[in-house]
């Protein structure tokens, strides 16, 4: 009975540790940090809005959560075997989730002075292209709804 209890406890601890180490890391990118990929500092709001296209809205987001983006180095016999089975492994790519976004208007009031309407003057945080009508993936078993994409990631 005592041996069975110790074995069960050992299996539970081992499973918990394996699961916890296989999870992707979550990192919140604070406001002052540079956004990745970096944008051209001379880009105007009109150019950025054109890059987003007609189905997306240019937005300025205060908060970005970055998940994943790490590479694991496995050593020894069987190292990394369980993390690969649990969905981990080497070269997991990152996903940026944008939050607290506000719309950036491309319409600029007409001023007598010729001023550049630079994007970096209107948004010091993270610039993203957000869907005008966010999708709903709740009815689909495989569907994923990504309402915002970093402007630097748009081709």
UniProtKB/Swiss-Prot annotation:
InterPro entries: Hydrophobin. The keyword Ligase does not apply. Induction: Primarily expressed in sporulating culture. Disulfide bonds join 52-129, 60-123, 61-101, 130-148. The keyword Zinc-finger does not apply. GO terms for molecular function: structural constituent of cell wall. GO terms for cellular component: extracellular region; fungal-type cell wall. Residues 1-22 form the signal peptide. Keywords: Disulfide bond, Secreted, Signal. It holds the Pfam family Hydrophobin. Its main location: secreted. It is found in: Secreted; Spore wall. Aerial growth, conidiation, and dispersal of filamentous fungi in the environment rely upon a capability of their secreting small amphipathic proteins called hydrophobins (HPBs) with low sequence identity. Class I can self-assemble into an outermost layer of rodlet bundles on aerial cell surfaces, conferring cellular hydrophobicity that supports fungal growth, development and dispersal; whereas Class II form highly ordered films at water-air interfaces through intermolecular interactions but contribute nothing to the rodlet structure. Belongs to the fungal hydrophobin family. Self-assembles to form functional amyloid fibrils called rodlets. Self-assembly into fibrillar rodlets occurs spontaneously at hydrophobic:hydrophilic interfaces and the rodlets further associate laterally to form amphipathic monolayers. This is Class I hydrophobin C. It comes from Aspergillus fumigatus (strain ATCC MYA-4609 / CBS 101355 / FGSC A1100 / Af293) (Neosartorya fumigata). The lineage of its organism: Eukaryota, Fungi, Dikarya, Ascomycota, Pezizomycotina. The gene is rodC.
């Amino acid at each position: 009975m005592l041996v069975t209890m110790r074995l069960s406890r050992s299996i539970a601890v081992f499973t918990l540790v394996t699961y916890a180490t296989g999870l992707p890391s979550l990192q919140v990118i604070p406001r002052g940090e540079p956004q990745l990929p970096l944008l051209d500092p001379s880009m105007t709001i009109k150019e950025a809005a054109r890059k987003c296209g007609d189905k997306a809205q240019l937005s300025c987001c205060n908060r970005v959560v970055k998940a994943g983006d790490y590479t694991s180095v496995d050593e020894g016999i069987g190292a990394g075997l369980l993390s690969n089975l649990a969905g981990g492994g080497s070269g997991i790519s990152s996903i940026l989730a944008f939050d607290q976004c506000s719309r950036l208007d491309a319409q600029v009031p007409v001023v007598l002075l010729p001023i550049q309407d630079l994007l970096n003057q209107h948004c010091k945080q993270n610039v993203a292209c957000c869907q005008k009508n966010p999708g709903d993936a709740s009815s689909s078993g495989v569907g994923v709804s990504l309402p915002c994409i970093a402007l630097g990631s748009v081709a």
